[in-house]
Amino acid sequence: MDIVSFAWAALMVVFTFSLSLVVWGRSGL
């Protein structure tokens, strides 16, 4: 795996995680 693929994978993980936190925060959990 090259560094570009790793960077994109990490970015997607961080984006998904923060989006989940926002959704959970808005629903009051």
Curated annotation (Swiss-Prot):
Keywords: Chloroplast, Electron transport, Membrane, Photosynthesis, Plastid, Thylakoid, Transmembrane, Transmembrane helix, Transport. The keyword Zinc does not apply. GO terms for cellular component: chloroplast thylakoid membrane; cytochrome b6f complex. Component of the cytochrome b6-f complex, which mediates electron transfer between photosystem II (PSII) and photosystem I (PSI), cyclic electron flow around PSI, and state transitions. It comes from Phalaenopsis aphrodite subsp. formosana. It is a single-pass membrane protein. It is found in: Plastid, Chloroplast thylakoid membrane. HAMAP family: Cytb6_f_PetN. GO terms for biological process: cytochrome complex assembly; photosynthesis. The 4 large subunits of the cytochrome b6-f complex are cytochrome b6, subunit IV (17 kDa polypeptide, PetD), cytochrome f and the Rieske protein, while the 4 small subunits are PetG, PetL, PetM and PetN. The complex functions as a dimer. Belongs to the PetN family. The gene is petN. This is Cytochrome b6-f complex subunit 8.
